[in-house]
Each structure stands twice: as structure tokens, then as C-alpha cells.
């Protein structure tokens, strides 16, 4: 029986509806961790004020590239910008690893008929978190590099590696072996993966648009809300990809 996107979408939404409480809690918890880590590692207000003093210069330099804008900063401002970027990247990476590990564990446990909470899912996922961390670090690096060179290569890399977290979690194989398997399966089933990835990207862009419309909320609360909504979108994509992989799962994989 052929695999259809409609069937996968229906299964994914059914799972989301049945496990909504656990998924919402997981999305909120990982969003809170992400925001708290970012607040802990971001430079202090005095340093940020030094960086924000250049905002008017950036606004008047609309035709310059990012590289040229950074080159115009003083060495002190460049160091502060690097700290801000590193804090945001690290906190987002940790939050995403916990979200992916917890979600994949939750999906796996529920598929086996076991009920688990969001906290239990994260706890059970601890053994696979180091491999997920390495995998997502490499994947993020490659995708960002592809987007920097040109947007299309970044999207292609994202599609190629989309199944690798599920493979690492379910097959307990190494990071690079999981990436290799993901590339083969993803390109062989690109018609089922690309539409879901495009919907995921579109949802993320809509959330970015909403950033400027949550000015009534304090910044930390707005950050948690937006991060939780973003995590919820990613959770739905993970359910879709997990279900797809279970239907495509090769029989010759050695665990």
C-alpha cells in the first residue's frame, strides 16, 4: 500500500490531539529552558547598550551586507556581538536537543502503549541526548553554511538530514551512519518530506512576523510564548517524520 501525505498528516494531527497536554508541557518546558539559558549567558545591559548604540548606523546602511556591517563595528562591539550570537545559538541548541529527545521518546513510548509525561520523556531520553547534541550541532552548522552560501543548499541539507534524529533515537546507531541513512531515505521520498518541511518553514516565518506584535508582554514572557509555539510546530513535524520513518524503516539495519 503506497504511503500518502494525507495519511501521514491525519495520523500526525490525531497523535497531537491525543497527546496535546504532554506535548504542550514539553514545548513550554524546553522554551523556558531556552530563554533562561539565553538570559544567563547573554552579556549584561551595559555591554548591550554599547552594541545597541550602532542601531541607527545599521538602519542608514541598508545596502551593505552583513559582513560589511560587522566590519564597521569596533573590536569591542564585535566581541559583544559574538557573545550575543553564541548565547543565542547555545541556548537554542540545548532547547532543541531536549525537545527532540523528549518528543521522540514520547512518540516511541506512546506507540508501545506506555503513558509517559513530558518530564519522564526527557528523563528517559537522557542516554541519547549526547548523540542528538552532536548530530544537531553538525546539522545546524551545515544548514547555516548552506543558507549563507545560498538559500537552496541550506533547504536541501535540511531535507537530507530530516530523518537523522529519528534514526539516532530508534536505531541507536552512530551520528554519521544515521546521517548517511537519512540522506538515502529522504531523497528517495522527497515528495513526502518537502511539503511538510515547507509548511514547517512557513509556520516559523509567521511566528517571526508575530515577534513585533507582542510588545504588550514583557520580553522574557514574549520570548517563552513564541519559543513554545515554535516548539509546538517542530513537535508536529517530528511526529510526521517519525511516522514516515516507521513506514519506510529498512529491515537490514543493525542496531
Curated annotation (Swiss-Prot):
UniProt keyword Transcription regulation present: no
Localization per Swiss-Prot or TrEMBL: Cell inner membrane
GO cellular component, one term: plasma membrane
Family: Belongs to the UPF0259 family.
Segments traversing the membrane: 22-42, 90-110, 118-138, 141-161, 192-212, 221-241
Keywords: Cell inner membrane, Cell membrane, Membrane, Transmembrane, Transmembrane helix
Record membrane topology: Multi-pass membrane protein
UniProt keyword annotation of Hydrolase present: no
Domain of life assignment: Bacteria
NCBIfam families to which the protein is assigned, alphabetical: PRK02868.1
HAMAP family xrefs: UPF0259
Protein name, per record: UPF0259 membrane protein YE2218
Pfam families: UPF0259
InterPro entries: UPF0259 (IPR009627)
Amino acid at each position: 500500500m503506497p504511503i500518502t501525505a494525507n495519511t501521514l498528516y491525519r495520523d500526525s494531527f490525531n497523535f497531537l490531539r491525543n497527546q496535546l497536554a504532554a506535548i504542550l508541557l514539553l514545548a513550554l518546558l524546553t522554551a523556558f529552558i531556552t530563554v533562561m539559558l539565553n538570559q544567563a549567558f547573554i552579556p549584561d545591559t551595559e555591554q548591550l547598550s554599547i552594541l545597541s548604540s550602532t542601531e541607527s548606523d545599521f538602519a542608514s546602511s541598508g545596502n551593505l551586507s552583513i559582513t560589511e556591517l560587522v566590519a564597521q563595528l569596533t573590536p569591542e562591539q564585535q566581541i559583544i556581538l559574538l557573545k550575543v550570537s553564541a548565547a543565542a545559538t547555545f541556548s537554542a541548541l540545548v532547547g532543541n536537543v531536549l525537545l527532540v529527545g523528549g518528543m521522540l521518546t514520547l512518540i516511541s513510548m506512546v506507540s508501545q502503549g506506555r503513558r509517559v509525561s513530558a518530564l519522564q520523556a526527557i528523563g528517559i531520553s537522557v542516554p541519547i541526548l549526547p548523540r542528538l547534541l552532536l548530530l544537531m550541532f553538525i546539522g545546524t552548522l551545515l544548514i547555516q553554511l548552506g543558507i549563507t552560501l545560498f538559500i537552496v543548499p541550506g533547504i536541501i541539507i535540511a531535507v537530507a538530514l530530516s530523518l537523522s534524529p529519528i534514526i539516532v533515537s530508534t536505531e541507536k546507531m552512530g551520528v554519521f551512519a544515521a546521517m548517511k541513512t537519512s540522506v538515502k531515505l529522504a531523497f528517495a521520498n522527497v515528495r513526502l518530506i518537502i511539503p511538510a518541511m515547507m509548511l514547517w518553514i512557513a509556520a516559523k516565518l509567521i511566528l517571526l512576523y508575530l515577534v513585533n506584535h507582542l510588545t504588550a508582554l514583557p520580553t522574557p514572557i514574549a520570548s517563552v510564548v513564541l519559543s513554545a509555539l515554535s516548539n509546538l510546530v517542530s513537535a508536529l513535524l517530528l511526529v510526521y517524520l517519525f511516522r514516515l520513518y516507521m513506514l519506510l524503516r529498512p529491515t537490514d539495519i543493525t542496531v
